[in-house]
Amino acid sequence: MAKLSAFADEVTESFLEQVKYLAGEKVGFIEPRFINKKNIMDLSKAELDEAKKMIDDYGLKVSAIGSPIGKVKLDEPFEPHLDKFKHAVDLAVFFETPFIRMFSYYAPEGKNIDDYREQVMERMAAKIEALSGADVAMVHENEAHIYGHSAANCADICKSVNSPKLRLAYDPANFVWGEKITNNVEVCWPVMKPYVVHIHIKDWKLGAGDVGSVPGEGDGQIKELLAELAAMNDDGCMTMEPHLQKGGQFGGSTGPELFSRAIAAVRELAAEVGLACD
């Protein structure tokens, strides 16, 4: 049975209200990213303890750490960034989640990221080393302007690094917004499917700017993707990130009413295609 999760910072800035909201919507997982307006990577020990208690008190589990790892340019120093990744590993262990969401770097200013393949692979390999001994894996999200902007490049990362510690988070809307693809299930999904363990539910209309669509109403083929998951008897997490008020490089906003509408739409679409969804 597939499981719903959410970037609940799109609902409200208050973390207590985030977990209350998800519990009320009967969404059993959360993907923490911004907690009381602070990135999860920047929280103090006391703030982390408080967040963990709220999650536990409302009966939620963590689908992945919503980290911004990999959203830096390749000409920035790597060691401080690797240290941040090691902290993300500690956070995953602390929040008892198997995954860290991450990205595959931007090119130096004015350069083409596809020309930096070797450097990307070296950094990914270094992060695999940092995962040694932890029951945690990276899930790389396809996104515009990073090396993994295309399905082929995402698969290339997994094939080249060749480790079960590196898998993919599939975001259909990012192919619409960044690659101008409106048939991602036909042309992107088959390429990435062998490595996908995590799904982002976000829909988009081609040319819509920085505002997403209610799932099923854009060009992201959400219903078709859910049908693919149903055929696989998928039991992973589908993380809601609808961006129905605005979206940006490091997050977005939706608000409670629109978020509830998005959740209802996904549940309805899942039922239509026979995807068991909790």
Task: Enumerate the language-model features and the residues they cover.
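Histidine-acidic metal/acid-base catalytic patches
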Residues: M1-A8, T12-G28, K52, D56-G59, ...
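A generic structural signal for short
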Residues: A6-F7, N39-I40, E76-P77, D115-Y116, ...
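Hydrophobic pocket-lining residues that define ligand/cofactor binding sites across diverse proteins
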Residues: L22, V89-A92, L131, L229
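Structural motif corresponding to the early beta-alpha repeats
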Residues: G28, P32-A125, G133, A137, ...
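Histidine/acidic residue-rich metal-binding segments in metalloenzymes
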Residues: R123-E129, K159-V161
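Aromatic-lined carbohydrate-recognition surfaces of secreted/lumenal glycan-active proteins
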Residues: V139-Y147, Y170
